[in-house]
Amino acid sequence: MDQPAAAEIVNLHKTFKTGLGKPVVHAVRGVDMNIRQGEVYGLIGPNGSGKSTLMKALLGLVRPTRGSCSIFGKSSLSPDSREEVGFLPENPYFYKFLTGAETVAFYGKLCGLSGRSLKEKVRELLDLVGLSDAADRRLGGYSKGMLQRIGMAQALVQSPRLVVLDEPTAGVDPLGSRDIRNIIENRKNRGMPVFLCSHLLEQVQEVCDRVGIIFKGLLIAEGSMNELTRDSDKQEILLEHASPCLLEELKKMVREDGRAVWLEDGHPRNSL
């Protein structure tokens, strides 16, 4: 028997009333989506496109106007569906008077951990997010990137089967963004499904197996990054140790073809 999808959304509609005599706002319009076991799924779209509303419906934080959402086969409207989900909201709030270790321990206790298992989990997660050296510092002295990494730690504290991240690099500098990306890749390598909401194309390109593009509440495209960004009218050739003579010969062949056009050449660039 096939395993259920990590998360499934079927014909989701969500409207909001804005006031007496005013038209309703259609935040999400008939979206179908599934997040497979072991994949990183990225939902991308501009601000106000419906990303956060869709994510909140999946987590059972808002009730769908029509349609359904489920997590590991359980309805999102059931509190049980959230027991195995780790969630990092956009701009999470933390108690600034607590240290990093105390913060992770606080969320661990909320999830039922205690004693030695709690201490080991706190130590493990602070090491994972690169904050072992700052474990005893109060959050009031943390940078934005450090706070986001503490947010990642609290999202993982109960060893969830699914992690949901809403704009995990919001307000974070490039180095902090890379740290968070590495944490996501670490979870992916362990087979944990991740649902990532973002408005940053570069972020989803780097870590996501599949991507959905949402605009004005509609899922207008979905697929792998290769499928979504492929230009079928062009061919790309990548050569190594090609001599100038070989390149000139290739350009000559293109000119003689009559239809093909040599657009550009140069050395490929690597990400910093």
Residue map of PLM features:
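ABC transporter nucleotide-binding domains
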Residues: 4-7, 14-215, 219-221
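Short stretches within intrinsically disordered, low-complexity N-terminal or propeptide regions
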Residues: 8-9, 262
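Generic marker of residues within folded, mature protein domains
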Residues: 2, 18, 227-229
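A structural detector for beta-sheet-dominated domains
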Residues: 10, 36, 240-242
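ABC transporter nucleotide-binding domain
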Residues: 181-271
